[in-house]
């Protein structure tokens, strides 16, 4: 993971920079680029990768209990001691008669230098702990998949909101253009004596309203650009140019068409379900490691070195130990830990069942939204066509002097609403396609 993250961090900014035509020009960003960058470079993904590295390091920590341990040691000691305190209370026969040992012995030096080594010969609990650490690392990798899928979804939705805001800006610009044309038409009609001053006032009011709505739309687009940069983990000041629009293919992914196939794909690919299964597996392995603590542990230990009162006078000494330990009772702490892991497994099983049902519900909901949005698109497109015809016909009536511009203003308002409805329908369809990809567990493949 560390090497992969380093390569991504090295080459991804260069790849993005290559898309920039000139210094200060906006960064051209497609929908697929946004999803790809977010799923590989977003801060949340980097943090998830680091957590995976931490879990892999814990495997090595657990494995250390099964590997040889080697150490070097040396010491110098200068001491005195009371012979009486050690129970040394006897006389030594000499030619001049029995003599007692002096009560104070020393001071004297002691030098010691040696190599210590130990190796577990049988330690099943440590073997089980290594397996548990591996299961936890698998869970961490599954959690990283959840994060990648989530960041891809976040970036996709942020991009959709941005291109929706971009479409709204284009609609409001078109509204302002029409309003300005109507002002010119009203003034011409008034100058020709076939229209009242109120018609000019109404037209100017519509123009001011359209300009105000355009300002709001531009602000929303700027805010949406910031949201996209945050989803990608890049500088919020980065200017972006969105190359995709709310077309019929935006937000597509390679997913099956049939409902049952979609559910099966979700059950097989959804990272949140994989993560839950990994958590249950880790809890089972942890429980197995706890149960293995009841088994005997066999270890061999040895040391070899030199020992003496002086360095030149030191001689070689050694120890060799074969030790077996059998846990008997630890205050029932082990049993309590087992009960905890059993509860964790049962809890995970409940979440797994709920997730399986949620996946089916997500697929059904996304399909309903998609079918509804596609139907809404057809209705919205027809409404937009009729609103444009209504505006054209009302303008002709106003030019001919057979109607006031109130009809034109009403038709213009209808066109504004029709444009918004069309944008909303296309946005809903794209969002439904993204939701369907997320339900199937393939949000990172959106294009």
Describe the role of every protein-language-model region.
Residues 4-17:
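Bacterial N-terminal signal peptides
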Residues 18-75, 81-82, 119-120, 134, ...:
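Bacterial Sec-pathway N-terminal export signals of envelope proteins
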Residues 20-26, 73-119, 245-256, 288, ...:
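Small/polar, glycine/serine/threonine/aspartate-rich low-complexity segments that form flexible
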Residues 25-27, 31, 41, 66-68, ...:
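Envelope-exposed proteins and targeting segments
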Residues 35-39, 90-100, 195, 199-206, ...:
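Amphipathic alpha-helical coiled-coil scaffold segments and their short linker/junction regions
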Residues 46-50, 63-64, 105-112, 121-148, ...:
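Sec/SRP-type N-terminal targeting helices
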Residues 64, 209-236, 373, 382-441:
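Short segments within alpha-helical structural elements
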Residues 148-265, 369, 373, 396, ...:
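Periplasmic alpha-helical coiled-coil/stalk elements that build and connect Gram-negative outer-membrane
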């Amino acid at each position: 993971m560390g090497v992969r993250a380093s390569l991504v961090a090295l080459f991804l900014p260069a790849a993005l920079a290559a898309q920039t035509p000139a210094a200060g020009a906006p960064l051209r960003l497609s929908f697929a680029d946004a999803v790809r960058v977010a799923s590989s470079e977003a801060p949340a993904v980097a943090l998830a990768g680091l957590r995976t590295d931490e879990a892999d390091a814990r495997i090595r920590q657990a494995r250390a209990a099964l590997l040889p341990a080697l150490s070097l040691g040396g010491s110098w000691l200068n001491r005195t001691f009371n012979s009486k305190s050690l129970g040394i209370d006897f006389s030594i026969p000499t030619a001049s008669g029995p003599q007692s040992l002096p009560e104070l012995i020393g001071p004297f030096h002691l030098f010691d230098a040696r190599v210590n080594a130990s190796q577990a010969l049988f330690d099943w609990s440590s073997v089980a702990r290594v397996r548990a650490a591996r299961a936890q690392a698998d869970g961490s990798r599954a959690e990283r998949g959840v994060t990648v899928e989530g960041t891809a979804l976040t970036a996709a939705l942020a991009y959709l909101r941005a291109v929706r805001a971009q479409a709204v800006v284009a609609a409001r610009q078109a509204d302002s253009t029409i309003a300005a044309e109507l002002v010119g038409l009203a003034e011409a009609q008034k100058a020709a004596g076939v229209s009242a001053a109120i018609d000019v006032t109404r037209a100017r009011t519509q123009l001011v309203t359209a300009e105000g709505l355009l300002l709001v739309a531009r602000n929303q687009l700027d805010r949406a650009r910031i949201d996209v940069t945050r989803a990608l983990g890049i500088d919020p000041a980065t200017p972006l140019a969105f190359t995709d629009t709310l077309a019929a293919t935006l937000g597509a992914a390679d997913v099956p068409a049939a409902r049952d196939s979609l559910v099966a794909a979700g059950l097989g690919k959804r990272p949140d379900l994989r993560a839950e299964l990994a958590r249950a597996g880790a809890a089972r392995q942890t429980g197995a490691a706890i149960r293995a603590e009841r088994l005997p542990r066999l270890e061999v230990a040895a040391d070899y070195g030199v020992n003496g009162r002086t360095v030149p006078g030191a001689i070689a000494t050694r120890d060799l130990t074969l030790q077996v330990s059998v846990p008997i009772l630890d205050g029932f702490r082990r049993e309590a830990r087992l009960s905890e892991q059993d509860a964790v497994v049962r809890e995970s099983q409940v979440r797994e069942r709920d997730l399986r049902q949620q996946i089916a519900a997500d697929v059904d909901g996304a399909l309903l939204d998609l079918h509804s949005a596609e139907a809404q698109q057809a209705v919205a497109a027809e409404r937009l066509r009729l609103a444009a015809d209504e505006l054209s016909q009302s303008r002709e009536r106003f030019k001919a002097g057979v109607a006031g511009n109130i009809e034109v203003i009403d038709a213009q308002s209808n066109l504004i609403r029709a444009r918004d409805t069309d944008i909303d329908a296309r946005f809903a369809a794209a969002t439904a396609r993204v939701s369907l990809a997320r339900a199937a567990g393939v949000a990172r493949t959106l294009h």
